[in-house]
Amino acid sequence: MGRTKLVGLAVGVLVLPLASTVGVPSAAAKNGDTHITGQGLEQTLDCNNSTLLVNGTGNRINAMGTCWAVTVQGSSNVVIAENVINDITVYGWDQTVFFKNGDPALIDRGRELALVNQISRVPA
């Protein structure tokens, strides 16, 4: 292999990773996201404009203030949120997420697998 081909190959190896990241939006996650993991927990918290992630079973979470997003995994969790800005994503089955304000995208990944979940707006 000649010197020209080696230089071209080296430049290609260096440029390709950079080209694949140009224009990629930054993630919306920030320090302060709240993670709740457990069974049978009852908790009231301030979302603080961050993402609330609930993972487990039988948890009952009251989220005050504004949440950027709410994500629930597991089964039989109940989340009541005052305001959700971006999205509510639910995995698993028998999950319930109520929100009072906001216009989030509602994504029910469990329903895609014929699992029953409930995501609903309720009166403030």
Task: Identify the residue ranges that each predicted region occupies.
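Secretory targeting and sorting signals
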Residues: 1-29
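Extended beta-solenoid/beta-helix repeat architectures
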Residues: 20-124
